[in-house]
Amino acid sequence: MTHPLQATIEELWERRTELSPQSPPTTIAAINSVIGDLDSGKLRVAEKIAGEWFTHQWIKKAVLLSFRVRDNRVQEAGDIRFYDKVDTKFEGWTEEQFRQGGFRVVPGTIVRKGSYVAKNAVLMPSFVNIGAYVDESTMVDTWVTVGSCAQIGKNVHLSGGVGIGGVLEPLQANPTIIEDNCFIGARSEVVEGVVIGENSVLSMGVYIGQSTPIYDRETGEVTYGRVPPGSVVISGTLPKADGKYSLYAAIIVKKVDAQTRSKTSINELLRP
């Protein structure tokens, strides 16, 4: 079913260079409505339909257009001041709104308006960008970056210093996706629209982009852009054909088993 604002956003995109903070109020209201629905979780940039991820390009366009129709303004958090076009998600929130949200936000966390955080999530000091979606019972640990429009599933653990790539700059066709029940090890980076299949575990310091070879030790197969569900992945190298050098690769060493789960399971005591 087509969203009532989709045609409007597509039309505005075709004449995006004409847009400014002085654009007609109806134009700005249409864009802000999409951002508001992203913020509340009514819309998301990508969703799984019939087992496959589908990106709503028009919503991503609305996120980009929002930068055209807003002026920078001074924002304050106590004695700290900022100057930006995007409001913070929790500006003006009351204690009751946080209670209704049902998640924890530790001091030092920055979440931009237009991102969604579901119940029972925990946000340690981290950065969650506009358009991102953080699902239920997910832990976003210290110094994690959740990039623009990234999709993070349920019961995910993003360990300290993890980077999940965004789509706005450099411009990407599809968001980076971490599916349900994944564990992403400390200082790992997943970018450029890569999909990490559900129940997978990435070891510490694994880097995966669209050009990173993903080698399955069991089958010998090399793939790109997607880690199959239930994979345990470590950093490694693959030798080149001439044997003169090796290049970085992500290595699937095995499938997740009970031992793996015992080491990476979430701790309910830390949830709200």
Curated annotation (Swiss-Prot):
Keyword terms, alphabetized: Acyltransferase, Amino-acid biosynthesis, Cytoplasm, Diaminopimelate biosynthesis, Lysine biosynthesis, Repeat, Transferase
Stored InterPro entries: DapD_Trfase_Hexpep_rpt_fam, Hexapep, Hexapep_transf_CS, THP_succinylTrfase_dom1, THP_succinylTrfase_N_sf, Trimer_LpxA-like_sf
Keyword Ribosomal protein found: no
Reaction(s) this enzyme catalyzes, per UniProt: (S)-2,3,4,5-tetrahydrodipicolinate + succinyl-CoA + H2O = (S)-2-succinylamino-6-oxoheptanedioate + CoA
GO biological process: diaminopimelate biosynthetic process; lysine biosynthetic process via diaminopimelate
Subcellular location field: Cytoplasm
EC number of the protein: 2.3.1.117
Record pathway: Amino-acid biosynthesis; L-lysine biosynthesis via DAP pathway; LL-2,6-diaminopimelate from (S)-tetrahydrodipicolinate (succinylase route): step 1/3
Gene Ontology CC: one annotated term: cytoplasm
Gene3D superfamilies: Hexapeptide repeat proteins (2.160.10.10), Tetrahydrodipicolinate-N-succinyltransferase, N-terminal domain (1.10.166.10)
UniProt-recorded Gene Ontology molecular function terms: 2,3,4,5-tetrahydropyridine-2,6-dicarboxylate N-succinyltransferase activity; nucleotidyltransferase activity
UniProt binding sites for substrate: 104, 141
Chief place where the protein resides: cytoplasm
PANTHER family reported in the protein's UniProt record: 2,3,4,5-TETRAHYDROPYRIDINE-2,6-DICARBOXYLATE N-SUCCINYLTRANSFERASE, MOLYBDENUM COFACTOR GUANYLYLTRANSFERASE
Quaternary structure (record): Homotrimer.
Entry's family note: Belongs to the transferase hexapeptide repeat family.
Listed name of the protein: 2,3,4,5-tetrahydropyridine-2,6-dicarboxylate N-succinyltransferase
Origin species: Dechloromonas aromatica (strain RCB)
Taxonomy of the source species: Bacteria, Pseudomonadati, Pseudomonadota, Betaproteobacteria, Rhodocyclales
